[in-house]
Amino acid sequence: MDKTYSPEAIEKALYKKWESHHYFQPRGEGKRFCIMLPPPNVTGSLHMGHGFQHTIMDALTRYHRMLGDKTLWQPGTDHAGISTQLVVERQLEAQGVSRKELTREQFLDKVWQWKEESGNTITQQMRRLGASVDWSRERFTMDEGLSAAVQKVFVQLYEEGLIYRGTRLVNWDPKLGTAVSDLEVLSEEEDGFLWHIRYPVVDSEEFLIVATTRPETLLGDCAVAVHPDDSRFRHLIGKQVHLPLCDRTIPVIADDYVDKEFGSGCVKITPAHDFNDHEVGKRHQLPQINILTKKGTINKNAPLKYQGMDRFLAREQIIKDLEQEGLLAKTEPHKLKVPRGEKSNVIIEPLLTDQWYVKTKPLAEPAIAAVKKGDIRFIPETWDKTYFQWMDNIEDWCISRQLWWGHRIPAWYDNHGNIYVGYSENDVRFKHKIDQSTPLKQDEDVLDTWFSSALWPFSTLGWPERTPELEQFYPTSVLVTGFDIIFFWVARMIMMGLKFTGKIPFKEVFITGLIRDSEGHKMSKSKGNVLDPLDIVDGIELDSLIAKRTSNLMLNSVRDRITKATRKEFPEGISAYGTDALRFTYCSLASTGRNVRFDLGRVEGYRNFCNKLWNAARYVLLNTDEEQIDFGDGAFQYSPADQWILSRLQNTVSKVHHYFETYRFDLLANTLYEFVWHEYCDWYLELSKPILQDDQALSAMKRGTRRTLIHVLDQILKLLHPLMPFITEEIWQKTTKFTSENGISIMLSTYPKVNEEFINPSIEEELDWLKSAIQSLRTIRSEMSISPAKLIPLYIRNITPELKERIAKYEKILKTLSKIDKINYLAPDEKVPVSATAVLGEIELLIPMADLIDKEAELSRLNKELAKLNKDIELAQGKLNNPKFTDKAPEEIIAKEKDKLAQAQLAKDKLLQHKNRIESL
C-alpha cells in the first residue's frame, strides 16, 4: 500500500471498473429492493442537495446489495420544461436567433440536439460521487416509453371526467408567457409602499380608505370588503362606493377574511388578480374583471387612458392621477413578500386564463387513506401532518404550460371549438368519426413537468406494459426526497400510482432536511455561499472559486461583497478532500431536522478519518502474512484484547443494522467513526503491539491476534462501504488474499452479521477497566508534562485480591502502554513521596513526582500561559461590555466572542489547578 491515501489516484478508475463490469445491475433472487432516483433536471449540475440525497440513496442501495437483496436503483433525468427551454433560447439568442423566428419543430430539434450534447453533465457528476445506479436502465421523461405512459394517463383521466379545461386563476409569468407552479414562485421580503386610497361613498360625504401595495389592480376592483363585526363600517355594508379613476361603482361587502387591525380595516377586492380576493369573490358572486394581458400590460377592460401601458408604468400614472384628484390619502414605506418567478425573476401575476386541470379530490382520497392506514410511512413521522394538511385542502391541479418543450397535450380542436382527446390525430378522427375534410388543430400547450414526474415510479419500469421489472420492483421500497416537494411530487406520485396500478408507489418516504451553510443560511447564488460538491472532492483555487461564485451577477456591489466574503472564508481556496470524506460528512449530517448546516471543517475531519483508516490498514498488512494468519485449521488463540474487539465489533454491527433500518444515518456514521477511530485504531491496534512484539508470546496467540486484526479490518471495510465506497474497495482488494473470501468487489461481498459467539460482556468490562487505568496514567503524564518516553514507577493503594489478579493478567499491556517500569502495591498506612494521583473505582494510582519534572521551569511556563490568557479574557470582556459592539455586531459574531471568552476562562481554570498541583510538590 502507498504510504498516504490519495483519493484522486483511485476513485475514477474504481468507478469505471464497477460500471464496466455491470456490478450495479440487479442480481440474484433475494428479497427485492428498489429506489427511484428523483430525476434531476437534464439542464442541471450537481448541487449540495443532490450530493446529500444521492449519498443516502447510494448508501441504502449498497447496503441492500450486500445483504443479498435483488437491488435496483433506477436512474433518469427530467426534461425540465421551462429550465431547458430557457437554456436553449439563451443559446440561440447568443447566436442572434430568436425562438419566434423558428417553427415549433425547428426549435424542438435544437432542444433535442442540446440535450444530446450537453444534457448529461449531472449524470457524469453523479458518477464522481459514486452513485451505483443501474445506468443500463437510465430513463428520460421525454423517452418514447414514458411519453406513451403520459398520453395513456391523460386520455384515461379525461375520459373519466378527471381532466377538464377551465378558466381559473393561475401564477402567470409575463416574461416567460406561461403559467408556473407554486414551487417555481419565490416569495422574499422586499421594501415597498402602502398606498392609502380614498373610495368615495355614493350619495354621501363619507369615503372609505383602502390600503394597497398594488394600486394598478384598482382598475379591476369589484368590491370593498370590511369585517362584519367592525362597528366603524357596519352602516355602509350594502352601499356603493365610486371606484377611483373608473367610471363605475362597486359594493361594500362584509367578509371574515378582512383583518380589522390591518391598515384602515377596509380591503379592495380584485377577484381576477389575487388568490384570496378570488375566494371572496366566489363567496359573494362578484364579477371577475381581468385588466392584464399575458404580457403584463393593461388590457381593454380598463379605462382608455391606461390601455397598453406596462403594469408598473400604469402604477406610476395611477398614483399621479390619484394625487391630482385628491384621492391619495397617504403613502408609507412597507415591507412585503413579493412573488417572483424562479427562472425569470419577474413579479408573478395572478391571472385568469384558460388552462387544463386535473380534478384532484377523487384522487386525493385514496392517497390520504394509504398514509392513514400505514401502507405508506413517512420518516420522520411528523411529516405525515404536512402531507395531510396539503391533501385535505387540495385544489384542482393546473397541468398546462404555455411552452414548446414538453409533453404536448393530446387534445385537438375543430373550427367550432369542440375538444377531442386521443393518442394521435388519427386516433381522434377514428374514435369520433371525423373525416379528413374537417380541419383539426392540436393544442399548443404542453403538460406541467410534474405530470410526467408523478408517473416516474411505474413508467420507468415499463408501465403500461406488464414488464418483469414492474412485477418485481413495484411498489418500490423507499423514496428519499426533501420536504419542499412532499406535495408537488410525493403526493402526486401516490395519487397516480394508486389510480393506475392499484398499488402504492413506495412503502416508505424518507424526508431529508435542506442543506444550508455553516451559519444556517440558505445556499443561493445571490448570497454567494453556494458550494459545488465536486469542488470539495477535487479542490478549487481561490480565484477560480470567486469567479464561479460571481459569474452572471449584474450588480458590482453584490459581486464585491461575495468576493470579500469568499476571500475571508477560504483564503487558500478549498482543498481536495475526496469523495469518501464528503459522503461520510453528508451521512453524519442526516439527522431528523428540517435544516442541515454544512461545515467544511467536518469534511476535513472525515478526510483525517480516511487517513486513519488507511494507516490502520497499512499497519495490519505490514504485520500479517498468509502463513501467520492461517484461516485453516492451524492452532490459534485469542488474547483478551482480541476477544474484546471481537465483542465490540458485534455491538457495532448490531447498531449499524438498526440505524440503516431506521434511517438514522447520523447515528450510523457516528457509531462507525467511534468504533474505527477510538476502539479499533486507538486501542486495539495499540493492544496488539505488546503481543506481536513479544518474543516470548505463544505463536498461537500471535496468530490469533493477526487473524483478529485482519478479520476486524475486513468487517470494518464492509460496514463502511455503503458510506465510503472508494477507500473501502481499494483497501479490501489488498486484504482478500488473507481472508477466505476472494470476491471480485467488496460491493458484491456479504454485509457483516452479528456473531453471538463473540459477544463477551465480562471481557468488555475488564478491558474497559484496563483502558481507564491506562488513560488515567496518560492524563497524569500530560498534566504534569512528563515525557511520554520516560519510564515511571506506579504505586497502587487499596488493592483487592480480585484487582491484583486482574492487574497481573494485564501487567504487560499496562506497563507497555503506560510506560511503567515497576508496579508497587502499598500497605494501607504506607507513605509515599509527593505524588500525582488518579482514583479508579476503589483504588488509587500514584506517580511520585520527584525527579520527573523541573518544578521552576514548569511554573515559569505556566505563568507565561496565564498572562496570555488574562490578556485574551480582558480583550473579550472589553468587547462584550461595550454597547457599540453589542448593539451593532451580528448575533453570530457576539456569540463567537462569548464562546471565545468562555473557552479562555475554562483554560485559565485548568492552568490554575495544574499550577497549584506543581506548587504543592
UniProtKB/Swiss-Prot annotation:
Keywords noted in UniProt: Aminoacyl-tRNA synthetase, ATP-binding, Coiled coil, Cytoplasm, Ligase, Nucleotide-binding, Protein biosynthesis
Any one GO cellular component localisation term in the record: cytosol
Cellular compartment(s): Cytoplasm
Catalytic reaction equation(s): tRNA(Val) + L-valine + ATP = L-valyl-tRNA(Val) + AMP + diphosphate
Segments forming a coiled coil: 849-921
Domain of life: Bacteria
Binding site for ATP: 525
Function recorded in the entry: Catalyzes the attachment of valine to tRNA(Val). As ValRS can inadvertently accommodate and process structurally similar amino acids such as threonine, to avoid such errors, it has a 'posttransfer' editing activity that hydrolyzes mischarged Thr-tRNA(Val) in a tRNA-dependent manner.
Entry's family note: Belongs to the class-I aminoacyl-tRNA synthetase family. ValS type 1 subfamily.
PANTHER family, A to Z: VALINE--TRNA LIGASE, CHLOROPLASTIC_MITOCHONDRIAL 2, VALYL-TRNA SYNTHETASES
Oligomer and partners: Monomer.
Protein name per the record: Valine--tRNA ligase
Phylogenetic lineage: Bacteria, Pseudomonadati, Pseudomonadota, Gammaproteobacteria, Legionellales
